Amino acid sequence: MTSENKRVLAVGAHPDDVEIMCSGTLFALRRLGYEIHVVSLTLGDCGSIEHSAEEISKIRHCEAQRACEMLGASYYHAGFSDLCIFNDDESNRRITALLRKINPWIVITHSPQDYMSDHEMTSLLVRNACFYASIPNYKTKDLTSATHTSVIPYLYYAQPIENIDIFGKQITPQFYVNVSALIEQKIKMLSCHESQRNWLRAHNGMDEYIESMRRWNASLAERAAQISGKSATFAEAFRQHLGHAYPKDNVFAALLGDGVMTEPAY
């Protein structure tokens, strides 16, 4: 499976979301020659107990840029504020305009079911944009140089934190990507977000920012190894959007080969 379009877009609600969700997979795709684009809808303006919204926004923007430089990715901020991401007309047109500008072949974003509404609304806006971007008569007000896309891209949802929805119900991924050889790069990229350690310790009771990510990716790898019989120390996990008009084949399996391990139910 090949395409002349080598662009991959990863969209998170806040700076550091993409790093946590899927940066190991992005490093793997970068090694294959893919062009990586990372979007944060907000600058994380509520993510501090020490700084004002303006101060923490500047800090987190710089942190996100440094992290993306390590990945060799282009970084964008979509102009939203924390806790103010909504599924409305203006927001849909804004994200659609950005998607048209980048014109990705593969898109990764949050799970539709997650622990906070910013993540869930981001997931919905990205899903909408993947579909809307290819409709010529759907007009956007900014980035007007970008025309409609020719195809609907592959769309993948990363696993929510702890693999659960808001009711604590387990969300089983469709497949896992072995990122064992890339975990150090992922750690270095996530470590760029220094401002978040104090915030997560105070608000979420999470003192071990990096170690929490390691444990989560290790638990995903344990399941991946169990179902596949392959060795994996760290893994990321995804579900593919398989609704009408979206691509149905798993392009990750084609690109990453033995590095992809699929749940038997799929």
Tell where the protein language model's regions lie, with residue ranges.
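Metal-dependent de-N-acetylase/amidase catalytic core
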Residues: 1-9, 88-266
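Active-site rim/loop-helix segments in enzyme catalytic domains that contact anionic ligands
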Residues: 1-102
